[in-house]
């Protein structure tokens, strides 16, 4: 398998998790390109990162990738985007990247489901519950956002329908997701986002009760024929709470995937759409038995994808061995593993569900635990990387103390 060469666009934890999976499975090193280096991949021996300041320009991307392919003729090249923007670029220009195997949905399908508003329309067809929502196409007065007009009570969630377009229009108070306590606050958030130049729809949504530990994450892999070949459910312990990182998983306990009532409907939806590649769903349990609400679909592997690999379902092997093997089997993970990218003690301290903490501690005691950055082959005889990783982990204590005070 030495002919395998993974290539990533991005340098974040998503990139490191996937590169680690390839290294574990096949002993190969990965290549990555991005606009700037990032801590999760700095000084790594398993990733060769190159800074390209305008890597978000599609013509630059094509030039770099064609040059790389020309230098590695005869190799089995795999290409993945590690952010929404990079994934979208690859999907749009996939027809011009024939040197690579680039698992991902067709461009027309991408256009129809990557935005939350459109995705909810698809969910309707397949009986997949999502939070009650109001869609806006422009700023409105607070009088139009009363509870009577919305059909649900405050506080509410406010977020852009298109994450890709949203992050292209930065402003000082920018957040990944917003909470509004009053109609006036909701109207002001919407006004500010549209004033930045954001061109798409806005989603105002009923708040689903419960903390981070009510969240679930579902990862699916579909082969080139649109058959779902693997699914893995994770129970979120705690998420990041920095303004730009809000909602990113910090610790997950993987669970029996068959325990999620929505799994079969989601599989049917993916296959009916002939979806290909990785998909990642954010889901929340409302506290009512059996009531789970899907928030969104990410049309790529998730940032926390190592929670899947840690169960034994190595995501690199899924791509290499199931993408075009002609099979139809679908493996649903049932193994429990405690995954985290923050120190375990941070996860234990800030997870409010103490029964879930007890499960995670038991898994840790059994050796069923994985921390993305603590990869021995990348740390051995690599003191600078080791120091960098320790510093990243150390800083998590301050981040959580600042942005997520312990609930007493």
Label each region the model flagged.
Residues 175, 181-184, 206-274, 298-323:
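ATP-dependent carboxylate/phosphate-activation module, predominantly the ATP-grasp catalytic core
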């Amino acid at each position: 398998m030495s002919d395998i060469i993974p290539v990533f666009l991005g340098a974040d934890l998503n990139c490191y998790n996937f590169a680690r999976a390839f290294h574990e499975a096949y002993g190969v090193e990965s290549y990555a390109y991005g606009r700037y280096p990032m801590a999760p991949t700095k000084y790594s021996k398993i990733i060769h990162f190159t800074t390209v300041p305008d890597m978000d320009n599609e013509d630059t991307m094509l030039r770099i990738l064609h040059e790389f392919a020309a230098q590695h003729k005869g190799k089995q090249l795999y290409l993945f985007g590690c952010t929404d923007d990079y994934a979208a670029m690859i999907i749009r220009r996939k027809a011009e990247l024939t040197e690579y195997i680039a698992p991902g949905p067709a461009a027309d399908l991408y256009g129809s489901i990557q935005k939350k508003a459109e995705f909810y329309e698809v969910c309707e067809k397949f009986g997949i519950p999502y939070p009650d929502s109001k869609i806006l196409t422009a700023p409105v007065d607070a009088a139009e956002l009363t509870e009577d007009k919305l059909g649900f009570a405050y506080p509410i969630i406010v977020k852009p329908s298109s994450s890709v377009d949203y992050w292209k229009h930065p402003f000082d108070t920018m957040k990944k997701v917003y909470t509004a306590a009053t109609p006036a606050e909701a109207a002001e958030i919407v006004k500010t986002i549209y004033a930045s130049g954001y061109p798409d729809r806005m989603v105002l949504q009923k708040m689903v009760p419960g903390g981070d530990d009510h969240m679930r994450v579902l990862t699916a892999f579909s082969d080139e024929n649109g058959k779902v070949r693997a699914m893995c459910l994770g129970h979120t312990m705690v998420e990041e709470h920095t303004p730009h990182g809000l909602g990113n998983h910090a610790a997950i306990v993987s669970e029996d995937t068959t325990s999620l009532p929505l799994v079969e409907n989601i599989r049917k939806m993916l296959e009916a759409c002939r979806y290909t590649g990785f998909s990642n769903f954010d889901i929340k349990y409302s506290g009512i038995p059996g009531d789970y609400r899907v928030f969104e679909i990410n049309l790529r592997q998730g940032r926390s994808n190592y929670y899947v690999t840690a169960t034994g379902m190595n995501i690199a092997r899924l791509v290499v061995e199931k993408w075009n093997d002609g099979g139809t089997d679908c493996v649903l993970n049932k193994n429990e593993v405690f995954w985290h990218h923050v120190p375990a003690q941070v996860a234990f301290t800030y997870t409010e569900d103490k029964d879930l903490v007890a499960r995670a501690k038991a898994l840790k005691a059994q050796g069923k635990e994985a921390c993305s950055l603590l990869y021995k082959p990348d740390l051995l005889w690599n003191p600078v990387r080791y120091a960098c990783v320790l510093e990243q982990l150390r800083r998590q204590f301050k981040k959580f103390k600042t942005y997520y005070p312990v609930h007493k």
